[in-house]
Every structure is written in C-alpha cells, then in structure tokens.
Amino acid sequence: MAEPELLLDSNIRLWVVLPIVFITFLVGVIRHYVSILLQSDKKLTLEQVSDSQVLIRSRVLRENGKYIPKQSFLMRKFYFNNQEDGFFKKTKRKVVPPSPMTDPSMLTDMMKGNVTNVLPMILIGGWINWTFSGFVTTKVPFPLTLRFKPMLQQGIELLSLDASWVSSASWYFLNVFGLRSMYSLILGQDNGADQSRIMQEQMSGAAMAMPADTNKAFKAEWEALELTDHQWALENVEEDLMSKDLDLSGMFSKDLPTGIF
C-alpha cells in the first residue's frame, strides 16, 4: 500500500522558503562588498615589478617577433638568452617563503577571512535554525536513500518521513552552496559571496599559496624563447602592396560640379 502524499501549506512557501532564499542571497551580497572594503592592497617591491615586466617583454618578443627584422629579433633574444651574460642566465632571485606566524599582514588577512566568511555563516545559520525550526520546506524531484536524511532533514527527527523532503535548516545550506551561479551573474566571476569557492580554496590551501618562484619563471621563459625561431611575416610585403590593382574610380564622381560658378 502506497503511503499518502504529504501536502505542504502554501504559507510555508511565502514565509519560510522564499525568506530563506532572500536572506541567504542578501547576506552573500553584503559579504562580497564587506570583503572588498576589508581587502588590503598587496605591496609589491620594485624588483617584483621589474621581473614581471621582463617576462612580459620576453613573451611579447616570442609572439610578435615575426614583425621586426631578423637582426632586431636576434639582438633582443641575445639580451635575454645569452649563455654567458643573458638576463635569464645571470639573474638569480632569492625566494623567501613567507611564514604566517611571523608576517602580521597574513595573520590579518586570515582574521578578515574568518570575519567575512565563517562568522556570518554561523550566525545566520543559527538564527535561521532557531526561527524556522521544524518546517518541511520542499522535496527533491527524485527518490533518495535513508543515508541522505541527516543531510537534508536537519532539525526534523521523523523516521517515517521520506528522505526526499528537505527541512528549513538544510534548505539554508543548500542555498549557501547553490546560489553561486546567481552570484557570478550579478557580482562577477571572482566574487566574495561564493561560499563554496572560498571553502574550496581554504581546504586546498590556495588562500595561503606561496608566491611563484621567479627563478623557475625565468628558466621556463628562457626555454620558450630558445625554441622560438624568427619567421619574417613581412617578406615581400612591398611587392604585394604595389602589385594590387588600386581602384581609384570611386574617388571621383561625375555628378560633382566642375566649376565654382
């Protein structure tokens, strides 16, 4: 015998489901702008700026070297890749990995991240669990096993309730991790409201990634430039332009007056 279908009151949609969605979305937007206000500017040294510009110059030479004469290309390549005194060969940078326990700025960034990400999630989640506790909000459109009951029915302990039903507390967490497409559409791709992306970065350690090794970047660029040959793209360009038939008939119109009077 089939179990009777559970019908929800329409007021639950108006006073529980939609408010949780709006509150979660607004908290994410506020968290995004608060993270922008608390974001500290990263200070770059003159050496870091100079190294980045050198890498850009080398990459531009590899991509657009075909538009300059071969002698000019070889001169620039010799400056970067000379075996004896080339820039990429003689330049060695000392890379000191920063320690979060000795760098006050890193500790400050960690504290700001906890304030803008973890604290609002705990406070709003606790408030929603206290305000909307005990409500069944919606049902997923496919059957689930009993293993999903602790995840989708937080705050509701009914053994006879189908695992496809979602409680109010679980509905909040589903919105926290399910509104990333809306945040990307409204706030942009790299926004501070995407809680799932922030948690993934914290779990993988990307939020405290060490700076790139400049020596490895120089070596990779040296190898790429060493494999680049000069392919003159403007060969016979003068003859090609002069050999084209120039149609000048359209420059003169027969209807134009030939005299002033």
Curated annotation (Swiss-Prot):
Annotated compartments: Endoplasmic reticulum membrane
Membrane-topology annotation of the record: Multi-pass membrane protein
Keyword field contains Transmembrane helix: yes
Main location group: endoplasmic reticulum
Pfam families per the UniProt record, alphabetical: EMC3_TMCO1 (PF01956)
Record topology, Cytoplasmic segments: 39-114, 188-261
InterPro entries for the chain: EMC3, EMC3/TMCO1
UniProt-listed SMART domains: DUF106
The keyword Metal-binding appears for this protein: no
Annotated GO biological process: photoreceptor cell maintenance; protein insertion into ER membrane by stop-transfer membrane-anchor sequence; retina development in camera-type eye; tail-anchored membrane protein insertion into ER membrane
GO CC field: EMC complex; endoplasmic reticulum membrane; Golgi apparatus; membrane; trans-Golgi network transport vesicle
Tissue-specificity statement: Localized to the inner segment and synapse in photoreceptor cells.
Keywords: Endoplasmic reticulum, Membrane, Transmembrane, Transmembrane helix
Recorded superkingdom: Eukaryota
Lumenal topological domain: 1-14, 131-168
Bilayer-crossing regions: 15-38, 115-130, 169-187
Function in brief: Part of the endoplasmic reticulum membrane protein complex (EMC) that enables the energy-independent insertion into endoplasmic reticulum membranes of newly synthesized membrane proteins. Preferentially accommodates proteins with transmembrane domains that are weakly hydrophobic or contain destabilizing features such as charged and aromatic residues. Involved in the cotranslational insertion of multi-pass membrane proteins in which stop-transfer membrane-anchor sequences become ER membrane spanning helices.
Family: Belongs to the EMC3 family.
Subunit description: Component of the ER membrane protein complex (EMC).
PANTHER family from the UniProt entry: ER MEMBRANE PROTEIN COMPLEX SUBUNIT 3
Protein name per its UniProtKB record: ER membrane protein complex subunit 3
